[in-house]
Amino acid sequence: DNILYSGETLSPGEFLNNGRYVFIMQEDCNLVLYDVDKPIWATNTGGLDRRCHLSMQSDGNLVVYSPRNNPIWASNTGGENGNYVCVLQKDRNVVIYGTARWATGTNIH
């Protein structure tokens, strides 16, 4: 899957995958985007702790937490509560999208 929804987490070793690209929460607390085997972006939090997790929060902030729930990295995109998604796109970019502003209202409950 290539989407992390509000309220969801990535535990150590879990990842978003979109073909050749992988966005992984590593065991060493580093969040890394890989193009095949080549790291192309990272939070540079490796070695700060072990077994951290990534959280897509309902305020739109993407945060790496230590096992004691201390934030060690954040996207600093927190705002109003809503529905947000973190998407690993086909163009290799990882993007946080926010709450929908309009809909037809024709969804089925």
From Swiss-Prot:
Subcellular location: Secreted
Tissues where this protein is expressed: Detected in bulbs (at protein level).
Protein activity control: Strongly inhibited by alpha-1,6-linked mannotriose. Inhibited by various oligosaccharides of P.pastoris mannan including, Man(alpha-l,6)Man-alpha-O-Me, Man(alpha-l,2)Man, Man(alpha-l,3)Man-alpha-O-Me, Man(alpha-l,2)Man, alpha-1,2-linked mannotriose, and Man(alpha-1,6)Glc, in order of decreasing potency. Weakly inhibited by elsinotetraose. Not inhibited by maltose or nigerose.
Disulfide bond sites: 29-52
Practical applications: A two enzyme-linked immunosorbent assay (ELISA) (with NPL bound to the solid phase and a Galanthus nivalis lectin (GNL) as detector) can be used for the quantitation of human immunodeficiency virus type 1 (HIV-1) coded glycoprotein (gpl20), and possibly the quantitation of free gpl20 in medium/sera, and screening for compounds and antibodies which interact with gpl20. When labeled with fluorescein isothiocyanate (FITC), can be used for the detection of very early stages of apoptosis, especially UV-B-induced apoptosis.
Chief location: secreted
GO BP: any one term: defense response to virus
Record key words, sorted: Antiviral protein, Disulfide bond, Lectin, Mannose-binding, Plant defense, Secreted
Cellular component aspect of the GO annotation: extracellular space
GO MF: D-mannose binding; protein homodimerization activity
Domain Bulb-type lectin residue range list: 25-109
Residues at which alpha-D-mannopyranose binds: 26, 28, 30, 34, 37-38, 41-42, 44, 57, 59, 61, 65, 72-73, 76, 83, 89, 91, 93, 97, 102
Subunit organization: Homotetramer; antiparallel.
Function recorded in the entry: D-mannose-binding lectin which binds alpha-D-linked mannose. Displays a high affinity for alpha-(1-6)-mannose oligomers. Able to interact with both terminal and internal alpha-D-mannosyl residues. Displays antiviral activity and therefore may contribute to defense against infections.
Protein name from the UniProt record: Mannose-specific lectin
Organism: Narcissus pseudonarcissus (Daffodil)
